[in-house]
Amino acid sequence: MTAESMLANGAFIMIGLTLLGLAWGFVIIKLQGSEE
C-alpha cells in the first residue's frame, strides 16, 4: 500500500464519516421534532 493510496482512502473515510454524521444528526433532529 503506497502513501498515495493511504491518503486517498483516508479522504474517502473522512467524507463517509462526515456524511454519516450529517445524516445521523438530521435523523435525531427529526425524531426530537416529532416528539414535541
Curated annotation (Swiss-Prot):
Gene from which the chain derives: petM
Transmembrane intervals: 9-29
HAMAP family with a match to the protein in the record: Cytb6_f_PetM
Name used for this protein in its record: Cytochrome b6-f complex subunit 7
GO cellular component: cytochrome b6f complex; plasma membrane-derived thylakoid membrane
Family that this chain belongs to: Belongs to the PetM family.
Annotated membrane topology: Single-pass membrane protein
Organism per entry: Synechocystis sp. (strain ATCC 27184 / PCC 6803 / Kazusa)
Role of this protein: Component of the cytochrome b6-f complex, which mediates electron transfer between photosystem II (PSII) and photosystem I (PSI), cyclic electron flow around PSI, and state transitions.
Subunit structure and binding partners: The 4 large subunits of the cytochrome b6-f complex are cytochrome b6, subunit IV (17 kDa polypeptide, PetD), cytochrome f and the Rieske protein, while the 4 small subunits are PetG, PetL, PetM and PetN. The complex functions as a dimer.
Pfam families: PetM
GO biological process: photosynthesis
Keyword check for Electron transport: yes
One Gene Ontology MF term: electron transfer activity
Compartment(s): Cellular thylakoid membrane
Keywords: Electron transport, Membrane, Photosynthesis, Thylakoid, Transmembrane, Transmembrane helix, Transport
